[in-house]
Amino acid sequence: LSLPRTQWKLCGIIPQANSMTRLCYSEAVKFESFDERLDYLKLWDVPHTSPRSVSMSLYKHKRWLITRDEIIKRDLGCDLGVFGIYIYGPIYVHHLNPITEQDIEVWSDVLFDPENLIATSMDTHNSIHYKPAATQIVERQPGDTKLW
């Protein structure tokens, strides 16, 4: 699926978020390559604030820990669920749609919805939230290191 971002089908509307378009896992996995999935999921051009002041109550809760384990198993420990791109080191479970303090305070279903969650590495998680992806890896070719 190599469609321009403007043509991507998104999963719907989040009523609480002023009609913000909702990303979802079932759409993300239709993109076969890691780069396409990363581009679909990037949030660095979407304004949001992280609810760090209350998020620890979520991330230490038994329900979250169970949900987190289920998502890691579903994605087979692979970055963005792309088979073969295994995560070595800490595995982050990313909310595709940013959560709010209110979501945590009322224990909104969006916190635990598998359609709103995906396994990522720390580098990928940071790329989704804070910066464009690093330079793509270029496949080496014979003679590409010649100086003259």
Which positions does each model-derived feature cover?
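A boundary/linker detector
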Residues: L1-I66, F83-G89, Q136-W148
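A detector for short metal-coordination/catalytic motifs
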Residues: P114-N116, D123, S127-W148
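Histidine-centered nuclease catalytic patch
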Residues: F83-I118, P132-I137
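Alpha-helical and His/Cys-centered functional microenvironments
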Residues: C11, M20, P98-I99, H129, ...
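Short cysteine-rich loop/turn motifs with clustered Cys
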Residues: R63-N97, S121-D123
